């Protein structure tokens, strides 16, 4: 922990205050004794003498967690934001890693937690009028595929689709992974944007997914041997594919008779029964995405766009029919693609 209370009630911040290690200190939340530590590996911090009576700090912090909290606090201060590190929120009975401008809670999550606990903490923030952003440490970084827990850290915007935030203590940067999609193998495909600690306004960086910007896109990685992959999944009785095969069989169809083009598009937006951080209805996005690629003539190529791309195409021509619809569709699609590709 980076904050401790002196016997006179004053709060000390180990990031910016001069601390006398001989003084007595208390945890601001549970008021139990803590000691000041300063070593070669861990940055200067406070630690409970005993955690058994504290319900707010359940385990000793890692060096990564301490360093990232300190880095964000310094960045927020440099950005002239009103910021508290380890802000105790009595009504919530929890501590926010950082509280920016009194309403934005930044949670640095370096270790795994249950989806139930994540939802409880997220809901608690929202019910009390706070906006919470979860920033992920190394153990929770998105790599080849999304876990169920990582899906509950996803956010959504029209400009960047599904996205999440990562913190890199070694590289000293905040990372935005966005336009996150999944292919038929269950692998994640996405773009990455990095922001060095301390450069620019912290809140401006965190608002990136909602700022006005040029639309971006990327070419999906497709499996040219998708039919062989599906056969293998059925041979090994993979539950997901066995379920789909059963559904098709009931309809008089069969996965084994499909061609590669039948599996187009191979890359789709992330799906889940629910999302912990997303509250808007995503049905229009899913429908527009599906309709766009269903209409595509080239089944050998899939370019992925942000949700606003599909929304703009369908916004004015979705209900039109016949030749007029086709002309408008082609003209609007070409114009949007030119804007994206900078042609």
Regions found by a protein language model. Name each.
Residues 85, 105-109, 134:
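Short catalytic-loop micro-motif centered on adjacent basic/acidic residues
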Residues 1-76:
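N-terminal cysteine/histidine-rich coordination modules
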Residues 156-343:
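Non-catalytic C-terminal interaction segments of nucleic acid-processing enzymes
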Residues 110-165:
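Catalytic cores of nucleic-acid endonucleases
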Residues 72, 98-114, 125:
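Conserved catalytic cores of phosphodiester-cleaving nucleases, focusing on short active-site segments
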Residues 91-93, 141-142:
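Short secondary-structure capping/turn micro-motifs that flank functional sites
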Residues 73-92, 98-101:
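A short acidic/basic microdomain associated with nuclease active sites
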Residues 40, 90-91, 117:
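Short secondary-structure boundary/capping elements
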């Amino acid at each position: 922990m980076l904050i401790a209370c002196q016997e006179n009630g004053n709060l000390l911040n180990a990031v910016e205050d001069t601390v006398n290690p001989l003084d007595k200190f208390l945890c601001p939340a549970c008021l139990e004794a803590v000691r000041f530590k300063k070593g070669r590996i861990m940055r200067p911090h406070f630690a409970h003498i005993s955690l058994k009576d504290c319900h707010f700090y359940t385990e000793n912090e890692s060096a990564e967690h301490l360093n990232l909290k300190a880095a964000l606090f310094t960045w927020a201060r440099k950005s002239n934001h009103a910021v508290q590190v380890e802000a105790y929120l009595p009504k919530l009975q929890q501590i926010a890693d950082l509280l920016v401008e009194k309403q934005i809670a930044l949670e640095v999550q370096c270790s795994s937690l249950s989806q139930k606990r994540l939802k409880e903490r997220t809901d608690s923030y929202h019910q009390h009028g706070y906006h919470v952003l979860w920033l992920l440490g190394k153990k929770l970084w998105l790599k080849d595929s999304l876990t169920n827990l990582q899906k509950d850290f996803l956010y959504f915007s029209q400009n960047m689709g599904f996205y999440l935030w990562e913190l890199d203590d070694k590289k000293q940067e905040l990372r935005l992974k966005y336009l996150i999609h999944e292919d038929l193998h269950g692998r994640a495909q996405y773009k990455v944007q990095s922001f060095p600690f301390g450069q620019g306004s912290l809140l401006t960086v965190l608002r990136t997914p909602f700022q006005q910007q040029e639309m971006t896109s990327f070419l999906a990685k497709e499996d040219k041997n998708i039919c062989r992959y599906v056969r293998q999944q059925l041979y090994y009785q993979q539950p997901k594919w066995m379920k789909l095969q059963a559904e098709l069989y009931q309809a008089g169809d069969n996965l084994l008779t499909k061609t590669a083009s039948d599996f187009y598009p191979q890359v789709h937006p992330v799906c889940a029964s629910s999302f912990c951080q997303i509250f808007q209805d995503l049905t229009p996005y899913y429908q527009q995405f599906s309709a766009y690629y269903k209409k595509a003539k080239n089944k050998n190529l899939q370019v992925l766009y942000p949700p606003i791309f599909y929304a703009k195409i369908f916004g004015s021509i979705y209900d039109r029919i016949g030749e007029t619809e086709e002309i408008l569709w082609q003209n609007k699609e070409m114009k949007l693609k030119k804007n994206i590709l900078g042609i």
